[in-house]
A protein has these predicted regions:
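Positively charged n-region of N-terminal signal peptides that target proteins for export
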Residues: 1-4
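Metal-centered catalytic cores of metalloenzymes
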Residues: 20-80, 84-176
Length: 176
């Protein structure tokens, strides 16, 4: 009997020690997905620019790890974000990925100006308020709901296209 209880206890501890698997999401960014500024749509952008965003959402630890890679844009990158909006609809910025304007939350990394890769981890401290879309600053649960409901998109803004040059809808999986 003692052996059975000990075996159950060891198995329980071993299971508790297993790392939580983060849920993968991704986006493929192009000018063809771009729509322009909120309430000032410009339509798609003809550009050679392209990018990819890889996300790993860990609901238990409330972290969103990301890697954003981009190249061949028409001008230097000013900032990149994740917005709350359906496919082909503009939405508010709720998370910064990088910025060269000094306007992101503390710890926001700089964007590689001409192209490259930037990585980071988003926590509740990096969640912005979007009052018009009922997002409260610091609400990581909102990030989870938005990402998992396919209503998030990544957008890279450049000097030439300040409203955004390339964009991609975030979807579940690694395919983008």
């Amino acid at each position: 009997m003692r052996y059975i209880i000990l075996s159950v206890a060891v198995c329980t501890l071993a299971a508790a020690a297993l790392p939580v698997q983060a849920d993968p999401f991704s986006a493929t960014l192009s000018g063809f997905e771009e729509i322009g500024a909120l309430n000032n749509a410009t339509g798609a952008i003809l550009t050679d620019g392209e990018g990819s965003l890889r996300l790993n959402l860990d609901e238990r630890n409330q972290t969103l790890n990301y890697t954003l890679t981009y190249s061949d844009l028409t001008s230097n990158v000013t900032q990149a974000h994740i917005h709350f909006g359906k496919l082909h609809v503009a939405g508010g910025i709720f998370v910064f990925l990088c910025s060269n304007l000094g306007n992101g939350p503390a710890g926001t990394p700089a964007c590689p100006a001409a192209g490259g890769t930037v990585s980071g981890t988003i926590t509740a401290a990096g969640v912005l308020s979007v009052p018009g879309q009922n997002i409260t600053a610091g609400d990581f649960d909102a990030v989870v709901q938005i990402i998992t409901s396919d209503t998030a998109y990544a957008n890279i803004h450049t000097v030439r296209f300040p409203a955004g040059e390339i964009r991609g809808q975030v979807t579940h999986g690694n395919g983008g």
